[in-house]
Amino acid sequence: MSHCTIFLYKYFPGKPRYQHCSFLHPLNHKLKSLFLPITGSRFLSNSTFSVSDSAHSHQAKPHVRNAQFDFKAYMLEKITAVNQALDAALPVREPVKIHEAMRYSLLLGGKRICPIVCLAACHLVGGDESTAMPSAAALEMIHAMSLMHDDLPCMDNDDLRRGRPSNHVVFGEGATVLAGYALIARAFEHIATATQGVGPGKILRVIGELAQLIGAEGVVGGQVVDLRCGGEGQMAIGLEQLEYIHLHKTAASVEASAVAGAVLGGASEEEIERLRKYSRSAGLLFQVVDDILDVTKSSEELGKTAGKDLAAGKTTYPKLLGMEKSREMAEKLKREAQEQLLGFDPIKAAPLIALVDFIAYRDK
């Protein structure tokens, strides 16, 4: 048994199965994820596509009508709303330096996938998105913190994030660590004080979900195993350990986002569980695609340092499985995520269906 294995436990029952499936192919109307800071976001045009085309036809036909969904317009609307909420939730105040460091990473742009999943899940189960917006903003604060700390020299040591210098390059390592702590505190404060329209029980459940996301059974647990396994001079890892790392570092964030939105929207426990499964598959899909892009795109195209994990000797999906198998795995995860949405209102499910396609076929 390797030193990595002793840290592992199953994140959810049953051993995941990755079978062969069709080769990853581009959408007829794909979106490029060209996201800029809060001053604006831009997409390619022609991003309206049929909801029924976004899942495999033999699974989607009984459920999804051939309705046109304008994903470009949806994303622009939600990103704008989230950016405005973040700006309002974290104004510059004393001490100015720490607030500037917090805002630098929080408002630096990005895909805003976690807050959008939160809002979409709330809407899917019949809730009011305004109820979920404080939690959506809090999730992005937590995500920003994780990226700030992930880039530190003692962690993954990256000087570039979203096409700009990483937080510690601009503000120094000490300020970055403290700004990350402050973002966590602000996230929970914001949920507790700004959430309206639901009872305290639901708010407490959301706070519990986000606390678990951050802790030893979430992002921290994944990062600990990541630091101990697969790097230069470390033990080699297999698919099970690699999956553990990314279920915790990446998929856990998407899962907490979906569950928070669903809880605030009044979902049943059965609906919450399906959205958990959706988000685990979508989160792993994001990481598999990220690893593929890391070896097929330049740093300029990605907005972060390309090929750094491979250069450091870390294990990635293409390194472990090869490019072809990694693409097959991505296609299967995409299908598994979308299958969890069968049975929901197809019109309300359209954003989450389209989001999985976007994750799968993005180019940065």
UniProtKB/Swiss-Prot annotation:
State the Gene Ontology terms under molecular function: geranylfarnesyl diphosphate synthase activity; geranylgeranyl diphosphate synthase activity; metal ion binding; transferase activity
Q: Which GO terms describe its biological process?
A: response to herbivore; response to insect; response to jasmonic acid; response to salicylic acid; terpenoid biosynthetic process
Q: What is known about the tissue distribution of this protein?
A: Strongly expressed in glandular trichomes, and, at low levels, in leaves, stems and flowers.
Indicate which residues the UniProt annotation says bind Mg(2+) 2.
D150, D156
What turns on this gene? Answer: Induced by jasmonic acid, thus triggering sesterterpenoids accumulation and reducing feeding and growth of the herbivorus insect Spodoptera exigua. Accumulates transiently after salicylic acid treatment.
Domain of life, source organism: Eukaryota
Q: Where does it primarily localize?
A: plastid
User: What UniProt keywords are attached to this protein's entry?
Assistant: Chloroplast, Isoprene biosynthesis, Magnesium, Metal-binding, Plastid, Transferase, Transit peptide
- The transit peptide extends across 1-51
Q: Which residues bind dimethylallyl diphosphate?
A: R161, K249, T250, Q287, D294, K304, K314
Query: What's its catalytic activity?
Result: isopentenyl diphosphate + (2E,6E,10E)-geranylgeranyl diphosphate = (2E,6E,10E,14E)-geranylfarnesyl diphosphate + diphosphate; 2 isopentenyl diphosphate + (2E,6E)-farnesyl diphosphate = (2E,6E,10E,14E)-geranylfarnesyl diphosphate + 2 diphosphate; 3 isopentenyl diphosphate + (2E)-geranyl diphosphate = (2E,6E,10E,14E)-geranylfarnesyl diphosphate + 3 diphosphate; 4 isopentenyl diphosphate + dimethylallyl diphosphate = (2E,6E,10E,14E)-geranylfarnesyl diphosphate + 4 diphosphate
- EC number(s) given by UniProt: 2.5.1.81
Copy out the cofactor comment. Answer: Binds 2 Mg(2+) ions per subunit.
Enzyme class label:
transferase
Subunit: Monomer.
Q: What does this protein do?
A: Involved in the biosynthesis of leucosceptrane sesterterpenoids natural products, which are playing defensive roles toward herbivorus insects (e.g. Spodoptera exigua). Catalyzes the condensation of isopentenyl pyrophosphate (IDP) with the allylic pyrophosphates to yield geranylfarnesyl diphosphate (GFDP), the C(25) prenyl diphosphate precursor to all sesterterpenoids. Geranylgeranyl diphosphate (GGPP) is the preferred substrate, however dimethylallyl diphosphate (DMADP), farnesyl diphosphate (FDP) and geranyl diphosphate (GDP) can also be used as allylic substrate.
- This chain's protein is named Geranylfarnesyl diphosphate synthase, chloroplastic
The scientific name of the source species is Leucosceptrum canum
Point out the gene that encodes the protein. GFDPS
